[in-house]
Amino acid sequence: YKRVGHEPSGNPFNSLVQLEYEKGIPRNPFINAGALVIADMLVSCLDNPKEDFSHFIREISGCDTTNYNLKVAKSEKDTGFRNAALTNFLKSFGNINNDVDLVLDFYFHQCSIEMTCKELADAFFFFANEGISKKGKQILTSSQAKRINALMQTCGFYDESGEFTYKVGLPGKSGIGGGIAAVLPKQFSVATWNPRLNEKGNSELGMYALEQLTTKTGMSIF
């Protein structure tokens, strides 16, 4: 946590303001600035970042065909001016070690992973299962899974994380493609998808569906 924090930001996911007065240390890994720093770390430690990342996603989802949507990756690159600004801003604070374009290319590909709701739910199962995937492989330690679940609970929905906790009561993570994955530790993982996003960047109907799920079943962490 020297390069990325673990606190909620309370600001929009692509904000530069907080990053400036906190000297280039993103509040958490789920806002864009934090994800870009994590991408930089992976570029530093992986021999073939894009290939290794797609292999990891296939491993945790249990689907050998899960891959990048190259049209989406190109679209992200063509319109990713705010992310380019964030990466250069992070670089100015010494919190990006690799070439900016290399980091951005990897990040845009991460944003373009394409999968079904079932594959997304399966990919998140190890967070619900003390770090063990559906195929029985230990991906994380139980302690690491607990900490990531805590991060998802407090930071997984940008500046709407409190609202999601209040209404749904599960650790979860939203994506700009309209997907949401959530977990009930030691019980299950679940995913929703609807592309209509609210003003906070989260799937409106996905959040509603998960609220109905936990309300009607009484299954939440609270």
Language-model regions, residue ranges each:
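Catalytic-loop motifs flanking and including active-site residues across diverse enzymes
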Residues: 30-37, 116-122, 186, 209
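Short glycine-rich loop/turn motifs
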Residues: 85-87, 120, 177-180
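Penicillin-binding protein/beta-lactamase superfamily catalytic region
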Residues: 77, 88-147, 200-203
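Structured C-terminal helix/loop/strand segments within mature extracytoplasmic catalytic/sensor domains
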Residues: 128-222
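Active-site-adjacent helix/loop patches that line small-molecule binding or acyl-intermediate pockets
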Residues: 1-110
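Short glycine/serine- and small hydrophobic-enriched flexible loop segments
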Residues: 39-44, 125-129, 215
